[in-house]
Amino acid sequence: MVLLNGKLKYIAVVAIFYNLIILLVKEKFPYICTKKKFHAISNRILYEYLNNFVSKDIFRREDITLKNLNFVQTNLKSDKDAEIKENRDTQSVDDNMFQRVYKFILNFFYGNKKNRINKSMNYGKYDNFNKINDIFEFMRNNGLPINITSVCLIDTGLNIKDALINYFLNHDISTYNSYTYHSVNINYKKPDSFNFGINSENCDEDNYSECESTFLENHNGHGKYEDKSTIQGDSLKLIEKKYDKNVDLQRSGIDVEICKAFNNSKEKKNSLNIIPVIKCLEYCKTKNVKIIHMDYNINEQNEQLIQIMDDLKNSEIFVILPSEKLFNEKPYEDNSVIYPSSFFEKFENVFFIGSLDYSDMSSDDADIASNFQIQKNEYLKYRKNNVFLLDSINSSLKKRDDHDILYYEIKYSSAFFINIITIILNIYPNMSIKELRNILSYSIPSKETAQLKTENIFEGNFDINKFIHILLNRGINSSGFVRKYKDVTPNESTNKIFLLEDQKDADIEPQKDSSIDIYCDEGGSDEDIVSTSNGLDVYSEYSHSNNKSDQLLNDEKGLKYETYKDLYSVKENDIYVFESNNPTNSSFMQMNYDDKIKSKYLDNLEEANYQNHRTQFEINRNDNRYPIISEDNLRDRQNMHNIQMLNDGINYSENANNIEELYDNDFEDYRGKDLNPEYNKIRDNNNNKNINKEFGILNTWRKNNEGLYLSDSEEESQPFKWMDMHVDDIYQDRKKRLKGNNYDNRNGRVRRIYEDNKRGRYIKNRNMQKKKNFDRNLKNKRYLNRRTKRHINEKNKRIMREKKNKYNNSVLKRNEMKSHNNSQKTPKIIPRKYSR
């Protein structure tokens, strides 16, 4: 600056000033100066801060009923790249003077840049569900939800005074512009009339068919908190993707049906009969919904109610009940007590969801009532610092001034559970209830307290982070399952039954003594492994000591002996052991029995998979005629023959991929028609006609040389020595036919001549092109006289002649060496492995 004159000083000062202004504005308002950058693969947005939760490989279920069948592979930036990006201000040495001045000023006024991290990356104690919403948003933006799930909500009606629900019904951005929600079948007509639900709160046995109405409004506005949380769920959000002036609105993944079954008044809502609930359940079933949520827990038995619950179970409809807000004919309710549902242990499609408000520090304990203790009013003490089944929503659902949401936050658990199931059903609409329970069982960690272990009605804590990890990362392997082990004495009582009102004492069903491993079947009963393995006694005399062959036989016979652990069948003293014999990256919803049964035959080249799954292979044919053959010897011999015959273009069969499949495809028939009459007597005449064409021409030759083969008695003791002779004979016969036609020599000579000519033409054309380019460049130089040009041309011609002679000599020498080697080559002799 000192060496510059006045005009240049003015220009330098102005340039520095404007550079600082631009840098500061760019940091403070980045959307003004630069376009927002994000990685996209086929319009699928990738969030870089979800590295720890989202797997790089997202698998789609390949099903013809789904719309998307492709495989999406996302390459997210690693955490190391993010750290480098954060520390770039101190580590970069390529910054110019203006950038260094800008960073100094920025750190001076705003502090260190490292402490300013994206808010979406800061997941604190009460931001757990914000993290989950980000993951769900990632799934939706990447095209994973490919279906729409219908949900029926049974409660006290809609609070249309609420700003969010009012916006949800009116679709008016000016009313509630902070949210962008949308539903397919909810159309708002007028405040007291809706066309997406019914009102059955006035139904009874007399007017059961004529009690429906369309008035769904909640008078006092204290109801439908679960519906509001469902609407707030990520599955209903509408994503706006702006491309220039066009706006692409993504369709939501849920349909909502409303049924008002409970009265708004707190004094009457618990004293009503069960008829409105039954009416709403029937209405939801007629709407072909997939999920039904009731705002109140039902702890009552009714024949008509049980019948409709059976219909819902047969229709594969999920029913979700909260743990609190007990509903029965008695005017009694205590929200501080967690009651079980009367359907929980009888219907596998019923999910009993509850949560404990561990954020409330005013009380340390919560009351939990079991089935046999409801009439006695005796409750167990359970500490609130342990989450029950599902995390409470806490303050993450609180929006602006909606303080009532924070007050009812412990009741959002069942509603938020709807969003979880909706996300799964949007991706896999054909998933069964049992498959979902198998998935959820992996998301329930072990019970932490002894008080909760004593109650068989409660399953344990539900870890939502573990569930999301299973959903997006690896999922449950198709071959992985949970085995159930028990160690219960006969004196211990584990299974408690539901008590009616007239019963005073509980009939305790004793548990059978079991000191061995037992499994749990579909109905939750225990089944002894030894008792189910009686049908496999035929193979017991050939089994090995390591019991791995027994496992193979169980897989071949079917999977009915290996039942899988369900969420509803959890009892006390259970130990969950995750076993995965085949840890492969597969979709977590592929839980069908057909997917778990691995194929008997594996590829020859997959040595690792073969050795991991089957260490021994048993061959039993024709009433156990052949003994058990060691797998290693069998595979080594087969690999040796495959390599020998593939080099000469000889294959066993078009459909035989390995030695086991080859042995099962009537391998004895390849020997010929009359070589072994005992085999032909057992087999049908049609099987003798299905001889492979590759070996059929050798029948006449083998008839004349029958003495070279083994006898029947020798073949029983050494069955595979005949196979070696068979392979050797095929090889020799094939060699003779190839030499007779002189195919090998003629084809090789023509191929070598063609390759030499092709390379010679290529080199000649390349040299000619170089010469032309060189001559053209020389002629363009005008400072050279005619004599100099002539000398240069003569020199070039001499060089080209030398190169040509050198190339011809090398080709001639190479041909002489080939002819010399061919003349000295001796015919290949393959020794016979067995001779008489």
UniProtKB/Swiss-Prot annotation:
SUPFAM superfamilies given in the database record: Subtilisin-like (SSF52743)
Region named Disordered: 802-836
GO CC entries: plasma membrane
KO phenotype (gene knockout): Ookinetes fail to traverse the midgut epithelium resulting in a reduced number of oocysts in the gut epithelium of the mosquito host, A.gambiae or A.stephensi. Gametogenesis, and ookinete development and motility are normal. The capacity to infect the mouse host by the few sporozoites made in the mosquito host is not affected.
Molecular function via GO: serine-type endopeptidase activity
EC number: 3.4.21.62
Biological process terms in GO annotation: proteolysis
Recorded catalytic activity of this chain's protein: Hydrolysis of proteins with broad specificity for peptide bonds, and a preference for a large uncharged residue in P1. Hydrolyzes peptide amides
Record key words, sorted: Cell membrane, Hydrolase, Membrane, Protease, Serine protease
InterPro entries registered for this protein in UniProt: Peptidase_S8/S53_dom_sf (IPR036852)
Effect in UniProt of substituting D155A: Reduced number of oocysts in the gut epithelium of the mosquito host
Source superkingdom: Eukaryota
Active site: residue positions: D155 (charge relay system), H222 (charge relay system), S414 (charge relay system)
Class in the EC hierarchy, top level: hydrolase
Coiled-coil region list: none
Subcellular location: Cell membrane
Function noted in UniProt: Probable serine protease which plays a role in ookinete traversal of the mosquito host midgut epithelium.
UniProt similarity note: Belongs to the peptidase S8 family.
Protein name: Subtilisin-like protease PIMMS2
Source organism of this protein record: Plasmodium berghei (strain Anka)
Lineage start: Eukaryota, Sar, Alveolata, Apicomplexa, Aconoidasida
Recorded name of the encoding gene: PIMMS2
